Amino acid sequence: MALKTIIHGSKEYEQMVALRYQILRKPLGLEFSPEELEKEKNNLLFGFFEEDSLEGCCMLVETAKGTVRLRQMAVVSGLQGKGIGRALVIFAENVARDRRFKKIIMHARKASIPFFEKLGYHTSGEEFIELTIPHVVMEKEL
């Protein structure tokens, strides 16, 4: 098992795009646009690997001074509930702290709220629709 930073455009990045498509986009009938993927060049990309196989991923993007947004978190379907997501979030939080960020925010799908609450995140604001499904803003001070 290894947690590591992924380089945009690498073989690992291609695995990351494929995993996010399978878990986050395909069920909604959506695709990634080339423009969306190009914007990810400036994001911090993270993966959870078992040997060379990507089992989970997420990314951080700076949104304001001292704040990053956790985005595009995905874990292989059959491996959810085994600690991969938790390990990824903790890894991302540690990288954010090392880079002197003070807060992490996210647009969490309603179904994932209990998971993030266990990791110390709290909801902020009202529910809204994003990519056709209900979300809520969650945040955590680092």
What function would you assign to each model-found segment?
Residues 1-142:
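Anionic, Ser/Thr-rich low-complexity intrinsically disordered regions
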